[in-house]
Amino acid sequence: MPLFDVYPLYNVTPVSGKGIHVYDDKGVEYLDLYGGHAVISIGHAHPNYVQAIKNQLDHLGFYSNAIQNPLQKQLADKIEALSGCKDYELFLCNSGAEANENALKLASFKTGKKRVIAFNNGFHGRTSAAVAATDNKNIIAPINAQQAVAILPLNDIEGVKTELEKGDVCAVIVEFIQGVGGLDQGSAEFFEAIDKLCKANNTMFIADEVQSGYGRSGKFFAFQHYNVTPDIIPIAKGMGNGFPIGGILIHPDIESKYGMLGTTFGGNHLACAAGLAVLNTIESEHLMDNVNVMSDYFIGMAKTIPQIKNIKGRGLMLGLEFDFEVGQLRKDLIYNHHMFTGGAANKKLLRILPPLNIEKTHIDQFFEALKKALSANN
């Protein structure tokens, strides 16, 4: 049976990984500066992570949410301890799209309203309301377009105010660092205005931390760089280091009721074991401190490359913007220099999302290869 052909693929077949490297079926080593869309947070095959999953598999891999699973509470407590998000409650699911879907559903339950505000170049997933709130018409089917969404420019405080005053908006959803859209960030004034306007208009403020969370910004959550208190915080990608897991942190003002949210696989024993291993490693290896040190070093190196016209993002969620489309450059880096990087909706942007335990030597290797690739492409 052929696979449904929806992914344009590079001709590389990774079969193993260790740390910041992956190895293909021919034994070639690649430096992974992309982590499969910011999923690999603590490095490929980290021994703590591998051992935790193996140990759990020896006991119980899965049972449904019809029984007690103490691992879920352990994971919730660890997220609270590392993030500093006190008094929030955790609902576990399986992916970022599912996290955002449940966040929007919960906002509608809480407010009794159904319209959503999202922003230009935002990406929130490929399902139902989440994809309707995504600024990409190519992936929105007619069935998704039934969801009422106002998509506004980033930093448009007056636009947000005008839409909220109509009285029918259940949620404002925003990425504090845009991922697929191209690493743009709103201003502090903008984010803080959203927070105040939502509170004044019975609207839920959703901070989409699916890609920017789990230490990638240099703080546990990207919204923590600002003076805001989101109502709902969707999380996923770096949460399981490759094991499918997602969730939403829910402000205590939102009351839970039996059956309002649910999932078969969400919060299963293996997923929780993976999630705990990631958090324990972020803590024990001081990876958020490393993010800040490596980010400063990376940005300093990037500033020495004249072809780089703009450096976007923060922490280890970075974008290098050129004055030409980077598709060929990415191919050169993969096939000739054996390095994985990412693209974005902005075709002139190279996206950098490495594991959080990257070292200076890896960054040096990247910039040496980038200089050679840029020279070859001139």
Segments (PLM) and residue ranges:
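Conserved N-terminal phosphate-binding loop of PLP-dependent enzymes in the Aspartate aminotransferase
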Residues: 1-378
